[in-house]
Amino acid sequence: MNKSIAPAPVVAAGDVKFGNSLPLSVIAGPCQLESRAHALEVASALKEIATRLGIGLVYKTSFDKANRTSAASARGIGLDAALAIFAEIRDSVGLPVLTDVHEAEQCARAAEAVDILQIPAFLCRQTDLLLAAAATGRIVNVKKGQFLAPWDMGNVVAKITTAGNQKVLVTERGASFGYNTLVSDMRALPIMARTTGAPVIFDATHSVQQPGGKGTSSGGEREFVPVLARAAVAVGVAGVFIETHPDPDHAPSDGPNMVPLRDFEALLRTLMEFDALAKKRPGAGTI
């Protein structure tokens, strides 16, 4: 292991740059990788929106939802089937790709076809997983655990940089507040920026999730996604993470907190306006 080094203040996935003082970028896509056709449909629509608005966009989706509430819940198509789809989105659609990994053994294989490996919030302290993700040389996006203080993310990031990888993003996705409820403390955004030195992302859709709130699945309050997203962008962040779907009410996972694809562009336009205002003057909007 190397001596711990500082994470890079600007991280680039292809042409998409993440930096706390740079113009806003976005990570977006459906919760679950449902099929090749569905993935390409959504990715193509998001590519068109990003091009029209002039914003950097990374496509996200999950090949396996390993922490579903119920054993009967749909988990996804699996890594073997996903790799070719990830590569097609990168090469044919022209978007960088993010996916989450749950086991150290998945990291090297997933890294063959994606630009960003994401560490789920529940696994953010798993040292072997963090080291395996870091060893791929890909960008590592770590979601802060719902149980973790924002200042504790410094130790999490140090595990990655100690392995020699400076390409780290940290994501806020809410904190547990009693049962089946999360709250977003906007102080966490500048605290994580200060204690980690990494670009900070705000996950606007999982922050409105109600974990296990529907008995055998999680609930959500998608009407509050724009509210929290605007608040985070007004603070000044490197990017926002927004799950979106053509028909979220019939999605296999996280439907209650996903933004309908038809509403995505209007939301993004608003967030870009907030971001421009927050970062209008030199030094302003830098968390």
Curated annotation (Swiss-Prot):
Pathway: Carbohydrate biosynthesis; 3-deoxy-D-manno-octulosonate biosynthesis; 3-deoxy-D-manno-octulosonate from D-ribulose 5-phosphate: step 2/3; Bacterial outer membrane biogenesis; lipopolysaccharide biosynthesis
Keyword Iron-sulfur on entry: no
Chief localization: cytoplasm
SUPFAM superfamilies on file: Aldolase
This protein's UniProt keywords: Cytoplasm, Lipopolysaccharide biosynthesis, Transferase
Protein's UniProt name: 2-dehydro-3-deoxyphosphooctonate aldolase
Cellular compartments annotated: Cytoplasm
Catalytic reactions of this protein: D-arabinose 5-phosphate + phosphoenolpyruvate + H2O = 3-deoxy-alpha-D-manno-2-octulosonate-8-phosphate + phosphate
Pfam family, one: DAHP_synth_1
HAMAP family: KDO8P_synth (MF_00056)
Presence of keyword Cytoplasm: yes
GO MF, one annotated term: 3-deoxy-8-phosphooctulonate synthase activity
EC number per UniProt: 2.5.1.55
Organism name: Rhodopseudomonas palustris (strain BisB5)
GO terms (BP aspect): keto-3-deoxy-D-manno-octulosonic acid biosynthetic process
